[in-house]
Amino acid sequence: MLERLALTLAHQVKALNAEETESVEVLTFGFTIILHYLFTLLLVLAVGLLHGEIWLFLQIALSFTFMRVLTGGAHLDHSIGCTLLSVLFITAISWVPFANNYAWILYGISGGLLIWKYAPYYEAHQVVHTEHWERRKKRIAYILIVLFIILAMLMSTQGLVLGVLLQGVLLTPIGLKVTRQLNRFILKGGETNEENS
């Protein structure tokens, strides 16, 4: 669905200025990413609204996205599956309880330690950056984690540390395995649906 829309947009942009734009493949890839983030954000906001926690869901989504960009992670084969799984994970982590103010610190540090141990993670088909660049991205992630913990303590933005915790958990071997199994489940569902139509 998102891939088709991205392809249509890429062809339209290419038709406007064929000589100065990138290839249709590159444009499609870029549009797919943009559409994925927009669609995910809309779904997160809708689910947050249904749960009466729109601000919490937005915090988790933003923090999770920043951490994901900086530290990598397993990817699904279809962007719509990725969107739905992201919303599912964000919804699940939103139910983690906060017994007291120290829970924010514990969740942030736990997520940070998992990121320290397991990041960066790349799939075989992904571009791997230089070691220098990866160290820089990881440092930025650590700075954001500290900032998110401080903001959680000062401004009650618990969702920021939950996003860090979510990313840390998804980088673990168990998190990667669960993501891969869900990817296979989604793909099998698609094949079954195609056979039935």
From Swiss-Prot:
It comes from Halalkalibacterium halodurans (strain ATCC BAA-125 / DSM 18197 / FERM 7344 / JCM 9153 / C-125). One of its GO terms (biological process) is proteolysis. Keywords: Cell membrane, Hydrolase, Membrane, Protease, Quorum sensing, Transmembrane, Transmembrane helix. May be involved in the proteolytic processing of a quorum sensing system signal molecule precursor. HAMAP family: AgrB. Belongs to the AgrB family. It is found in: Cell membrane. Its EC number is 3.4.-.-. This is Putative AgrB-like protein.
